[in-house]
């Protein structure tokens, strides 16, 4: 009993058969290798645009793995096809095959070669990993906040970052205090802006459940974990616009938590916008946006509109509001809310109802909708913090929606 | 050289008592009945889970949400699809195969603990009821991975709690079954059958059972904490109160990665049996196949955090990459050994063999994509995308389910005493193979291009691929009905199978089909080599079995011929 | 009744022994899991116990642990005595063991109820000790039932699987507790 390791051929090899087998093995081997390489050439067409330094490395690693994997696939399937053709039992042939139990040499070969392949892959992957991760903090840093179901990107204005034509004493007092404070003044945008060639770091924080920050074109992804701050970095090498996608199941709107393209080809939701250089970045994004918060409109309704457009709060994912181009389909429609809010609950004015709906959304559910809206709290440090000043402005704006 | 003892002159082999449907619906400690109960129940849930998959693919025909009422309803679809397929289809189905076959392969009358065996099965019934009850209480919607805080604070229905209790019951069932298998295999092998003389399916079940007993308790721990957080106000996973969401991820995956080997190792065992018998050739590299199963079982405990490459501490990514790469080696050994088994054999294209060949071609793709996923820089791009969905279905459907199908076609005659129609089987295979490939292969591409998983809403440029995938999935769904029809036809009017229609050497075939209550007529003596095809003595043994236990209805041209001359003995 | 075991009985005994061993190997993993959870949670805090939280008592649980270890000794002594046809020694040893076991549960119940509440520190303590207590109680009750049966003469020197099985299960309770004791009170 036990393993019989003798190869027991039941036919004589034809003369010169040995060298013929070797030739066939060499041919098959070459076919495998070239086939694998051929398969690997499709790599660019199954990846999104290669827009970061990291992407180049990842794609090359993948191309190599696809070549190796493709070769192995060709080997296995090639042998299968050969076996099916050459060793099929002819009709009526019920004899057994030869009693071959194994071949130690062959088994060692097909243990050692895969081990070597796997070792090579490990080393190569390690090298790519070392070069794409960063250890030191980077200047160009943006804070991203994920919440159900939208992304907000927070930029900082410090006295050093003031737009060219602005000086500190031009600013109103509360705003000047914010700018000169240790943390600087924040403004937020639905889109992430940076410029080409500059390594960028994004710090990641979630307001509620776990999310994941993924930019396919950059080949980078990092989970947002409740209770922790994580970060990701990348270096764009192509100017352009790139979709940002949430890649961790976060609830009913998980699929909505990604950049989309609106009817007018406008970018909605989370996109990465890479400007060709810092000058363009400042001119087309940073300075206009900074100016909006440094010199906010007097009219609270206009201020409210500005806040909502800035996407510090994830309202756009769930609500329809034509004035702002919102097409969310999870929560009630907000068109004409300025009028309707007064009629929703007897005893509550429109103003009171709107404030309540934002501070305590579960109180008066609209029939047909579930209790999914986050509660926007008034105390700094609590989840989904919305200061009273913002709330006032937003409610003022919503009250103007009377079409 | 051992042979079956000759019957006394004039003694007739008693016909097996025909079992009725009602025998399978009540408590029984007979491992054969329990095995069928497991397999029938599992198959029911396969259809249920498959129906959920059809709904998912229907929704994904368009990039917007237009089939399900809202995102929550859609999330429930894939949560239950995965939970049911993993815990109520594959794991119990493999347990069913094990239950039916292991005592027979070892020449035993039953498992070591028959009463415990029955208990393990009947735990599945309330578990399944709880899963279904979840639909009436706000079904679980956080994916089968149930990451908190989505599965705790943000899942308000009770379905998630029912889900956790159901999985508790299934875990206990699994552990009890595994204990039974280990003791049976260790203590109840017949005289002369050392570990290295037992069938590879038994090795596979042994390795699987070792994983189950060591890993499932971690699932129990994770589920207990989840339930406490949901109903008892604890804060294990609530960071605002000092908890940590990564505790769940680590504990959950410490079980759930070995779980995938629980799902595939028995399939590997089935492959070895089917390939050897239907290619009429010994298994190539028996020892390597046996030991690689154990190696995979043990190494499988070292890789779990590769499911967490984008959420774990970055410094730990590389060690888990290393362990995940290493586990490819024993798996590769198996594939090459199976190719070696086929090489030089006499391949019969029975449905069982077709599905085994399908396994070999599709599982290798899953294995290759698995190695790619082990590479951290690449995984970071494709983690939580359809690339992963593709990989997991290649190994779980292209692997485990194909192996299950092969096993069904192979052992159906033994269990029922009837043959499954071979032409229907070939049709089933063709539809399944084509449907499977075009459902799942394009998912690699759409994932790499930027489609995340677990979404009903996606970027419009992916619609073409999604339509192809969905149409192929509908074909895959339809293919199941061919099998159902074939099974019904066989039970009502199938050809009588006889004891050993495939002329196999393992001990389950050395008795009538179906076997009598005590499995064997007299004391069974195993043939010296469960894979000893190609020898004169094997031929004589098989003739003996045919003579003693009867041949079924055979087609005219399938008359056995004597073994090759000079083929070694 | 004191005759040699038949082949079938020996086979059943071998199966039961292997089965119990595998079960224990499996079940200790839940305790290992809770240990791991404890370690991972405490790794998130600068100090353990966290700021402002009182440490667990040391004296009473250590006393209880000593009692538990002693009970294991007595349970084993009882089994050996039974095998040596020393029925009286068996019964007395188990009486003492049951008393010690009950004392352990009583002390730990007191600890469980009196520990001041904190979100993580006391909660993980209570989950771990509570989980262990369930096992100590269930297996303790099994011990008591077997003891009761033994007093009625149910077991002898050759046929006493219930005694052997519950002895081993009680060892399991003790080993599991030692793991928890080290994690909760020493490390």
Residue locations for each model-derived region?
Chain A
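Alpha-helical transmembrane segments of polytopic membrane proteins
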Residues: 66-70
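Non-transmembrane, membrane-proximal soluble domains of secreted or membrane proteins
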Residues: 3-20, 38-64, 77, 84-303, ...
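Detector for the c-type heme attachment site
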Residues: 250-251, 318-325, 339, 378, ...
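Alpha-helical transmembrane segments of integral membrane proteins, especially early/N-terminal helices
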Residues: 22-44, 71-78
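Axial heme c-ligation environment in periplasmic c-type cytochrome domains
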Residues: 314-317, 327-337, 359-391
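Aromatic- and Gly/Pro-enriched helix-to-coil junctions and flexible linker segments
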Residues: 61, 397-401
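Conserved P-loop NTPase catalytic core
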Residues: 333-351
């Amino acid at each position: 009993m036990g393993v019989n390791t003798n190869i027991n051929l039941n036919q004589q090899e034809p003369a010169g058969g040995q060298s013929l087998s070797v030739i066939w093995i060499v041919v098959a081997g070459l076919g495998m290798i070239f086939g694998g390489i051929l398969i690997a050439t499709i790599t660019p067409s199954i990846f999104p645009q290669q827009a970061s330094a990291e992407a180049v490395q990842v794609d090359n690693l993948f191309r190599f793995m696809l070549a190796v994997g493709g070769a192995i696939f060709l080997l296995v399937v090639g042998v299968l096809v050969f076996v099916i053709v050459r060793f099929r039992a002819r009709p009526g042939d019920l004899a057994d095959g030869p009693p071959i139990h194994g071949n130690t040499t062959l088994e060692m070969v097909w243990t050692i070669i895969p081990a070597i392949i796997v070792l090579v892959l490990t080393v190569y992957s390690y090298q790519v990993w070392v070069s794409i991760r960063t250890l030191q903090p980077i200047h160009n840093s943006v804070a991203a906040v994920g919440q159900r179901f939208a992304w907000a990107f927070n930029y900082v204005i410090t006295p050093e970052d003031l737009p060219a034509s602005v000086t500190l004493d031009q600013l109103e007092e509360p705003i000047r205090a914010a700018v000169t404070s240790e943390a600087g003044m924040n403004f937020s945008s639905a889109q992430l802006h940076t410029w080409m060639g500059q390594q960028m770091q994004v710090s990641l924080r979630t307001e509620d459940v776990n999310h994941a920050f993924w930019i396919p074109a950059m080949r980078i992804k990092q989970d947002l974990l409740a209770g922790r701050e994580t970060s990701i970095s990348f270096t764009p090498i192509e100017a352009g616009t790139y979709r940002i996608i949430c890649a961790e199941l976060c609830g009913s709107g998980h699929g909505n938590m990604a950049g989309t393209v609106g009817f007018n080809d406008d970018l909605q939701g989370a996109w990465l916008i890479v400007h060709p250089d810092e000058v363009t970045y400042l001119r087309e994004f940073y300075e206009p946006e900074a100016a909006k918060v440094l010199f906010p409109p007097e009219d609270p309704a206009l201020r409210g509109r500005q806040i909502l457009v800035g996407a510090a709060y994830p309202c756009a994912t769930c609500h329809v509001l034509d004035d702002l181009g919102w097409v969310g389909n999870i929560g009630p429609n907000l068109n004409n809310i300025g009028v309707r809010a007064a009629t929703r609950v007897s005893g509550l004015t429109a103003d009171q109802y709107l404030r309540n709906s934002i501070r305590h959304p579960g109180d008066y559910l609209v029939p047909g909708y579930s209790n999914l809206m986050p509660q926007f709290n008034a105390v700094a440090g609590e989840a989904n913090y919305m200061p009273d000043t913002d709330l006032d402005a937003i409610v003022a704006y919503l009250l103007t929606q009377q079409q | 050289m051992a042979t079956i003892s000759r019957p006394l002159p004039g003694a007739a082999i008693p016909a097996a008592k025909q079992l009725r449907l009602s025998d399978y619906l009540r408590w029984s400690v007979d491992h054969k009945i329990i095995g069928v109960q497991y397999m029938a129940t599992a198959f029911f849930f396969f259809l249920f889970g498959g129906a959920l998959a059809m709904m998912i693919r229907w929704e994904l025909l368009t990039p917007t949400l237009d089939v399900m009422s809202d995102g929550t309803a859609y999330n429930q679809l894939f949560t239950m699809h995965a939970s049911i397929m993993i815990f109520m289809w594959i794991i119990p189905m493999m347990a069913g195969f094990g239950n039916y076959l292991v005592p027979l392969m070892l020449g035993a009358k039953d498992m070591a603990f028959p009463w415990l065996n029955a208990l393990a099965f009947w735990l599945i019934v309330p578990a399944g009821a709880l899963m279904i009850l979840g639909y009436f209480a706000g079904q679980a919607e956080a994916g089968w991975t149930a990451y908190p805080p989505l599965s705790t604070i943000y899942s308000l229905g009770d379905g998630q709690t029912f889900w956790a209790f159901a999985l508790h019951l299934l875990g206990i069932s699994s552990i009890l079954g595994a204990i039974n298998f280990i003791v049976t295999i260790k203590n109840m092998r017949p005289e002369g059958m050392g570990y290295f003389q037992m069938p590879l399916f038994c090795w596979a079940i042994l390795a699987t059972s070792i994983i189950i007993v060591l890993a499932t308790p971690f699932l129990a721990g994770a589920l207990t904490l989840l339930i406490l957080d949901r109903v008892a106000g604890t804060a294990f996973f609530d960071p605002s109160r000092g908890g940590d969401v990564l505790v769940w991820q680590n504990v959950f995956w410490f079980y759930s990665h070995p779980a995938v080997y629980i799902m595939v190792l028995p399939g590997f065992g089935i492959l070895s049996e089917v390939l050897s018998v239907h290619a009429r050739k010994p298994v190539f590299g028996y020892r390597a196949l046996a030991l690689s199963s154990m190696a995979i079982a043990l190494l499988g405990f070292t890789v779990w955090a590769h499911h967490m490459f984008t959420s774990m501490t970055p410094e730990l990514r590389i060690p888990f990459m290393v362990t995940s790469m290493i586990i490819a080696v024993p798996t590769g050994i198996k594939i090459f050994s199976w190719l070696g088994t086929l090489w030089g054999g006499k391949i019969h294209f029975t449905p069982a063999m077709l599905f085994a060949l399908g396994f070999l071609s599709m599982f290798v793709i899953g294995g290759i994509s698995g190695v790619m996923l082990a590479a951290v820089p690449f995984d970071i791009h494709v983690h939580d995308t359809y690339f992963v969905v593709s990989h997991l279905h290649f190994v779980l459907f292209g692997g485990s389910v194909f192996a299950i199908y092969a096993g069904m076609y192979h052992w159906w005659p033994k269990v029922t005493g009837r043959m499954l129609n071979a032409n229907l089987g070939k049709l089933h295979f063709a539809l399944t193979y084509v449907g499977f490939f075009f459902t799942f292969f394009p998912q690699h591409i759409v994932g790499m291009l930027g489609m995340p998983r677990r979404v009903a809403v996606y970027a419009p440029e992916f619609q073409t691929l999604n339509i192809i995938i969905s149409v192929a999935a509908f074909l895959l769904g339809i293919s199941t009905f061919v099998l159902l029809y074939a099974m019904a036809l066989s039970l009502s009017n199938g050809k009588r199978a006889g004891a050993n229609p495939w002329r196999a050497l393992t001990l389950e075939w050395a008795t009538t089909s179906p076997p009598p209550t005590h499995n064997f007529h007299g004391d069974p003596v195993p043939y010296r080599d469960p894979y000893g095809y190609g020898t004169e003595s094997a031929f004589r043994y098989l003739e003996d079995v045919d003579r003693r236990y009867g041949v079924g209805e055979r087609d005219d041209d399938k008359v056995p011929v004597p073994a090759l001359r000079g083929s070694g003995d | 009744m004191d005759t040699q075991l038949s082949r079938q009985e020996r086979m059943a005994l071998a199966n039961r022994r292997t089965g119990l061993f595998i079960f224990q190997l499996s079940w200790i993993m839940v305790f290992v899991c809770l240990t791991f959870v404890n370690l991972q949670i405490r790794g998130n805090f600068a100090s353990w116990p966290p700021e402002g939280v009182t440490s667990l008592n040391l004296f009473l649980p250590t006393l209880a642990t000593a009692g538990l270890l002693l009970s294991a000794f007595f349970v084993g002594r009882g089994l050996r005595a039974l095998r040596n046809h020393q029925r009286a020694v068996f019964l007395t040893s188990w009486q003492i063991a049951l008393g010690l076991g009950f004392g352990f549960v009583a002390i730990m119940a007191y600890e469980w109820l009196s520990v001041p509440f904190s979100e993580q520190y006391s909660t993980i303590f209570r989950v771990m000790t509570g989980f262990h207590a369930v096992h100590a109680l269930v297996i303790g009750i099994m011990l008591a039932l077997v003891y009761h049966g033994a007093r009625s003469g149910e077991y002898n020197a050759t046929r006493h699987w219930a005694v052997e099985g519950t002895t081993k299960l009680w060892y399991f309770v003790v080993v599991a507790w030692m793991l928890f004791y080290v994690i909760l009170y020493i490390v």
